[in-house]
């Protein structure tokens, strides 16, 4: 079953067309990797999935992005969409507050005040982000005291505290060391049991390790998408073969 169906999607930044007639299904509860060289459109597409591109002046979008059969560019509440489709950015962006308050922030913003409810969600979310055992004795400590990898997992915990259906990840490990990267990748493998994950990555090795599906973009076009194993071992398009072989990038 598909979580997203993208049909005939075009996106323009002013006169520059950044996405060209994209047609892509994104299956539920799997990891889909978006790959391609810098400027190919993969991050632009990712931002289409929760309408982050709306924040950029001069953007024009045509086509359909259906989430569970509903057009997200139709008559919907964008704030609700961004709860349902959470996002983890390239650089960890914990809020300037305690570990506990970071995770509880979204719930409090929605008016949740019951401490038992907040405590339960904070613990569940930190466990879900594989961070609880590392921070359970210092929840009141400032989030900036965590390592880079811990901060990124805290941001994941903050995202899943809002109970999204989808988690978008824009190069979430590019600023992390190999050990922290491995922990986040292990976490993605666990999270996909409950969430649909779409990740942008420049690392071919990472895409191959963690994703079920891979989509290759080049100059705003979707060249090919298939099972990850096929994309890396037997792609249909010579351009895909050249990219995964490292012939260009």
From Swiss-Prot:
Organism: Aliivibrio fischeri (strain ATCC 700601 / ES114)
Matches recorded under Gene3D superfamilies: P-loop containing nucleotide triphosphate hydrolases (3.40.50.300)
Pfam families given in the database record: ABC_tran (PF00005)
Membrane topology, record value: Peripheral membrane protein
Purpose of the protein: Part of the ABC transporter complex PstSACB involved in phosphate import. Responsible for energy coupling to the transport system.
Domain ABC transporter as annotated: residue spans: 4-244
GO biological process, alphabetically ordered: phosphate ion transmembrane transport
InterPro entries referenced in this protein's UniProt entry, alphabetically: AAA+_ATPase, ABC_transporter-like_ATP-bd, ABC_transporter-like_CS, P-loop_NTPase, PstB-like
Subunit structure: The complex is composed of two ATP-binding proteins (PstB), two transmembrane proteins (PstC and PstA) and a solute-binding protein (PstS).
Family membership noted in the UniProt record: Belongs to the ABC transporter superfamily. Phosphate importer (TC 3.A.1.7) family.
Known EC number: 7.3.2.1
GO CC terms in record: plasma membrane
Record's protein name: Phosphate import ATP-binding protein PstB 1
Gene Ontology molecular functions: ATP binding; ATP hydrolysis activity; ATPase-coupled phosphate ion transmembrane transporter activity
Subcellular location: Cell inner membrane
Keyword Iron-sulfur: no
Binding site for ATP: 36-43
Primary location: membrane
UniProt keywords, alphabetically: ATP-binding, Cell inner membrane, Cell membrane, Membrane, Nucleotide-binding, Phosphate transport, Translocase, Transport
Reaction(s) the record says it catalyses: phosphate(out) + ATP + H2O = ADP + 2 phosphate(in) + H(+)
PROSITE patterns membership: ABC_TRANSPORTER_1, ABC_TRANSPORTER_2, PSTB
